C-alpha cells in the first residue's frame, strides 16, 4: 500500500541532507540509497525464494499434501505475489523518490497490494476454522472438508479478496477530494495512496479487522480444546501405567503403543503451535499499519510519514517469515533439505516412521507387521493397543475409519497439518 503524501525521501537521507558541504551530503545520500537498495533486495529475494520453496515442497512430496497444507499453499502464493509484484515496485518508489510506471500501473499495483493482504488474512482465518473442525469433530472432518472442497474454499477466498481490493480502487471509490490528492491522481509520477475516510475505515474493517477477530476467537477455542486433550493424555497415561505395569514389563508392546500415541498427539499439538505462530506473526506485522491507516484519515498529520512507511514495510517483511516458521515442522524441514540437495532424496525416514523416496512419494518404514490400510500413504498412520487407549486416536486429527491389524491393534488415519 503506497504511502500517504509525497514525503518518501526520509529513507534516503538520515540527517535530512542539510550538511553545509554539498559533496559530503551527496556521498551520504548515495551510500544511504545503496544500503537501502541492498536491504530491500534481500527482502525481495527472501520472500520469493522462501515461498517458492514452500510451494514446490508441497507440490512434490505427497506427505505434505494435506488439506491444511493446501491452505498453506494459498498463503504462500499470496506472499509470493507480494514479493514479485508489490515489494519491488514499492522499493523503486522510495529509492527513486518518484513513481516511474504510470497511473494505470499505480492503481493496479495498489490493488494487488490490498489483494495479497486480504487473501492472507482470510486464508489464516480459514485455517483456524479448519483446525477447529478437525480437533472438535474428528469423525466428521474428512467428510466435511475434502481436498476438492478445500480447493473451492481457496478459490472463494481469492474471489472475495479480489472483489474487496480491485473493485473499490479500479472504480475510484477510494479517492479523496482535497487538492493534493487530486493533483497526485493526475500526475504520472505520483503514486501516493490518498484515500477518503469512508474507504480507509471500511476497507480496513472488511479486509483485516473482521477476519482477524474471527481468527483470534476460533484459534483461542482450538487451543482450549487442545489443552484439555493434553491433560486427558497425561491422566490416561498415568492410569495406563498404573494398571498395566506388570504387562508392560513382560511385553513392552503396550507401553510402546502408548508412547507412540502420546508422541503422535504431542506432534499434532506442536503443529497447532506452529500455525499459531504464523497467525501471531502476521498480526504483529500488519496490525500496527492498519491502526495507523485509520488514525491517519481521522487525524491528518498526526502520524509522521516515516512511521507510516516503516509500518507498511514491516507488513511486507512478514511475507518472508512464514517459510522460516514452517521449518519448525520436521516434515517441511526434511522436504526443504531434499529440495536444496542438503539431504539424499532416497529412502530418508521421517521422525514418525515415514520415508520419502526419490519421486516424492511417502512410504511407511516403521515396525514390521504394521496395519494394512487401503488408503494413500500420504496420511498419517496411528496403530494403538486397545487397553486404556480410548480418546488418544482423535487427539487432534481425524478418524474416518478403524481397522485391526494382526496384533489386535486399532488403526486409524489422520490428515495431519504441516
From Swiss-Prot:
Keywords from the UniProt entry: Cell membrane, Disulfide bond, Endosome, G-protein coupled receptor, Glycoprotein, Golgi apparatus, Hydroxylation, Lipoprotein, Membrane, Palmitate, Phosphoprotein, Receptor, Transducer, Transmembrane, Transmembrane helix, Ubl conjugation
Modified residues (4-hydroxyproline): 387, 400
Database matches in Gene3D superfamilies: Rhodopsin 7-helix transmembrane proteins
InterPro entries (UniProt xref): ADR_fam, ADRB2_rcpt, GPCR_Rhodpsn, GPCR_Rhodpsn_7TM
Any one GO biological process: response to cold
Short motif (PDZ-binding): ranges: 415-418
Post-translational modification comment from the UniProt entry: Palmitoylated; may reduce accessibility of Ser-345 and Ser-346 by anchoring Cys-341 to the plasma membrane. Agonist stimulation promotes depalmitoylation and further allows Ser-345 and Ser-346 phosphorylation.
Residues linked to a lipid group, S-palmitoyl cysteine type: 265, 341
Subcellular location: Cell membrane; Early endosome; Golgi apparatus
Full protein name: Beta-2 adrenergic receptor
Protein's gene: Adrb2
Amino acid at each position: 500500500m503506497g504511502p500517504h503524501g509525497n514525503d518518501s525521501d526520509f529513507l534516503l537521507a538520515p540527517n535530512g541532507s542539510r550538511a553545509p558541504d554539498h559533496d559530503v551530503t551527496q556521498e551520504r545520500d548515495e551510500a544511504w540509497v545503496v544500503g537501502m537498495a541492498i536491504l530491500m533486495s534481500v527482502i525481495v529475494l527472501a520472500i520469493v525464494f522462501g515461498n517458492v520453496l514452500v510451494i514446490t515442497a508441497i507440490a512434490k512430496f505427497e506427505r505434505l499434501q494435506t488439506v491444511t497444507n493446501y491452505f498453506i499453499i494459498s498463503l504462500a502464493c499470496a506472499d509470493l505475489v507480494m514479493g514479485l509484484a508489490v515489494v519491488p515496485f514499492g522499493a523503486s518508489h522510495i529509492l527513486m523518490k518518484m513513481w516511474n510506471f504510470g497511473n494505470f500501473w499505480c492503481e493496479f499495483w495498489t490493488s494487488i497490494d490490498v489483494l495479497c493482504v486480504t487473501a492472507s488474512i482470510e486464508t489464516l482465518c480459514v485455517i483456524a476454522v479448519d483446525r477447529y473442525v478437525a480437533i472438535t469433530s474428528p469423525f466428521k472432518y474428512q467428510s466435511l472438508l475434502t481436498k476438492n472442497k478445500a480447493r473451492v474454499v481457496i478459490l472463494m477466498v481469492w474471489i472475495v479478496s479480489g472483489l474487496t481490493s480491485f473493485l473499490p480502487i479500479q472504480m475510484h471509490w477510494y479517492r479523496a477530494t482535497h487538492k493534493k490528492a487530486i493533483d497526485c491522481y493526475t500526475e504520472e509520477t505520483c503514486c501516493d495512496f490518498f484515500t477518503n475516510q469512508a474507504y480507509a475505515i471500511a476497507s480496513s474493517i472488511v479486509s483485516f479487522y473482521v477476519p482477524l477477530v474471527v481468527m483470534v476467537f476460533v484459534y483461542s477455542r482450538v487451543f482450549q480444546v487442545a489443552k484439555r486433550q493434553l491433560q486427558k493424555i497425561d491422566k490416561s497415561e498415568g492410569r495406563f501405567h498404573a494398571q498395566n505395569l506388570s504387562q508392560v514389563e513382560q511385553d513392552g508392546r503396550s507401553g510402546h503403543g502408548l508412547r507412540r500415541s502420546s508422541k503422535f498427539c504431542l506432534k499434532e499439538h506442536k503443529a497447532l503451535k506452529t500455525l499459531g505462530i504464523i497467525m501471531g506473526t502476521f498480526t504483529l506485522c500488519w496490525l500496527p499499519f492498519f491502526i495507523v491507516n485509520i488514525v491517519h484519515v481521522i487525524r491528518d498529520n498526526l502520524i509522521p510519514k516515516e512511521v507510516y512507511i516503516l509500518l507498511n514495510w514491516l507488513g511486507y517483511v512478514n511475507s518472508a517469515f512464514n517459510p522460516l516458521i514452517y521449518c519448525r515442522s520436521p516434515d517441511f524441514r526434511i522436504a526443504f533439505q531434499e529440495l536444496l540437495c542438503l539431504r539424499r532424496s532416497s529412502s530418508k525416514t521421517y521422525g514418525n516412521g515415514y520415508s520419502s523416496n526419490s519421486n516424492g512419494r511417502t512410504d511407511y518404514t516403521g515396525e514390521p507387521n504394521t496395519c494394512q490400510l487401503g488408503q494413500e500413504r500420504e496420511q498419517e498412520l496411528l496403530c494403538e493397543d486397545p487397553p486404556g487407549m480410548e480418546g488418544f486416536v482423535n487427539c487432534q486429527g481425524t478418524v474416518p475409519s478403524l481397522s485391526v491389524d494382526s496384533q489386535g491393534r486399532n488403526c486409524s488415519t489422520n490428515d495431519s497439518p504441516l
